[in-house]
């Protein structure tokens, strides 16, 4: 669990996981995630077995919902893993009233999801809230119009990489070179 230098702001969303960005699409929010139904921005991060598997809060706020769902153990890098695999949902409400969803998804090898946060807890941005063992995935659900600051294929660092800007002031990145 390496130390991280987390940007502290009221509107930036940092990566909750270390790994490769799989998706930054707009799609229907899962029905079992306690957010209003409709189109939301999903940013998916895949952690391979060599990545740090500690999960960190992408924003500061109060945990308002959690839910565990049993499921399959498909390869976490495929799209249907988001709804078919074992997963742990968490919804965080920011001071602004904006809610975001964070979903820990077990992978082919990972069969142990640990959520350390509970409903009513306050999380600081970058604070450890859980861990997933071995290859797995974390999906972050944001309002559909949220501009993203990462590209598919880019490597994200948990607690440090800025995924998005909820203030709407940052321009969305649509192309570029990723490491």
Residue ranges and their predicted role:
Residues 1-179:
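Contiguous, well-folded functional domains in the mature portion of proteins
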């Amino acid at each position: 669990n390496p130390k991280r230098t987390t940007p502290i702001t009221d509107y930036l969303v940092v990566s909750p996981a270390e790994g490769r960005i799989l998706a930054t699409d707009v799609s229907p929010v899962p029905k079992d995630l306690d957010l209003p139904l409709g189109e939301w921005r999903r940013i998916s991060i895949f952690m391979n077995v060599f990545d740090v598997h500690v999960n960190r809060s992408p924003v500061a706020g109060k945990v308002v919902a959690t839910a565990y769902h049993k499921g399959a153990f498909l390869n976490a890098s495929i799209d249907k893993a988001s709804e078919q695999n074992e997963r742990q949902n968490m919804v965080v409400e920011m001071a602004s009233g904006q809610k975001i969803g964070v979903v820990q998804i077990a992978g082919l090898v990972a069969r142990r999801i640990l959520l350390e946060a509970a409903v009513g807890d306050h999380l600081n941005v970058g604070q450890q809230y859980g861990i997933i063992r071995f290859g797995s995935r974390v999906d972050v659900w944001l309002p559909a119009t949220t501009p993203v600051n990462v590209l598919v294929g880019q490597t994200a660092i948990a607690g440090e990489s800025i995924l998005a800007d909820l203030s709407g002031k940052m321009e969305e990145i649509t192309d570029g070179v990723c490491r």
